[in-house]
């Protein structure tokens, strides 16, 4: 079972993933799972080096160079982390994945959604998420949270409000391409409320519910 998490910076994805694991372990202490992220990956040296290059404030990358780096990092991540875990029938929780790439590189960076999808399909094989959870906050809310938490720490965080507004709109466009895969959660709620909503909607999802009962 492969679940990805998407949303603007400051939406709380990383915290929510960690807290969701805790809630699921309460229900099933023997749950077999991994938590990973993109760009980079869980204990993947090569992908993490690419992540550092992409996010370095000193990096000056063209959109195509940035896209190719993301794609290379993703392929390594899939080979070394995601596919092995899925073959063992583990629950894979990933903070960002292909939908970030479609929104940021395909739409906002101007490479084209078709090009981004073609590039992605070359490397992901069958590793399409079963479920994608989108934590829904606006660009203004994202900027406020990042400023309050001082999360302006890398090249993408330091982009303008206008850039993040475009990313928000791009995400909505991406979601509309495959709406059945997405669980959209109101990110303005408290963390406990967000978690309760996610857990409720996960167990209402037939694919997740069947996996849970059989593992």
From Swiss-Prot:
SUPFAM superfamilies: P-loop containing nucleoside triphosphate hydrolases. GO terms for molecular function: ATP binding; dTMP kinase activity. GO terms for biological process: dTDP biosynthetic process; dTTP biosynthetic process; dUDP biosynthetic process. Keywords: ATP-binding, Kinase, Nucleotide biosynthesis, Nucleotide-binding, Transferase. Its EC number is 2.7.4.9. GO terms for cellular component: cytosol. It catalyses: dTMP + ATP = dTDP + ADP. InterPro entries: P-loop_NTPase (IPR027417), Thymidylate_kin-like_dom (IPR039430), Thymidylate_kinase (IPR018094). ATP binds at residues 7-14. Pfam families: Thymidylate_kin (PF02223). PANTHER family: THYMIDYLATE KINASE, UMP-CMP KINASE 2, MITOCHONDRIAL. Phosphorylation of dTMP to form dTDP in both de novo and salvage pathways of dTTP synthesis. Belongs to the thymidylate kinase family. This is Thymidylate kinase.
């Amino acid at each position: 079972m492969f679940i990805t998490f998407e949303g603007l910076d400051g939406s709380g994805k990383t915290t929510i993933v960690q807290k969701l694991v805790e809630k699921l372990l309460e229900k099933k202490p023997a749950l077999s799972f991994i938590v990973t992220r993109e760009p980079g990956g869980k204990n993947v040296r090569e992908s993490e080096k690419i992540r550092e290059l992409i996010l370095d404030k000193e990096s000056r990358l063209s959109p195509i160079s940035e896209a190719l780096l993301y794609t290379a990092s993703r392929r390594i991540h899939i080979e070394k982390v995601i596919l092995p875990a899925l073959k063992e029938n583990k629950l894979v929780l990933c903070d960002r994945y292909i939908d970030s790439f479609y929104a940021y590189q395909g739409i906002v960076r101007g490479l084209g959604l078709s090009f981004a999808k073609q590039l992605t399909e070359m490397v992901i094989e069958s590793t399409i998420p079963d479920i994608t959870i989108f934590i829904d906050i606006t660009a203004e809310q994202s900027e406020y949270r990042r400023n309050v938490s001082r999360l302006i720490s890398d090249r993408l965080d330091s982009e303008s409000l206008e850039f993040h507004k475009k990313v928000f709109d791009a995400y909505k466009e991406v979601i509309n391409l495959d709406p059945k895969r997405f669980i959209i959660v109101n990110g303005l709620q408290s963390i406990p409320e967000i978690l309760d909503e996610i857990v409720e909607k996960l167990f209402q999802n037939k694919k997740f519910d069947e996996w849970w009962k059989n593992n």
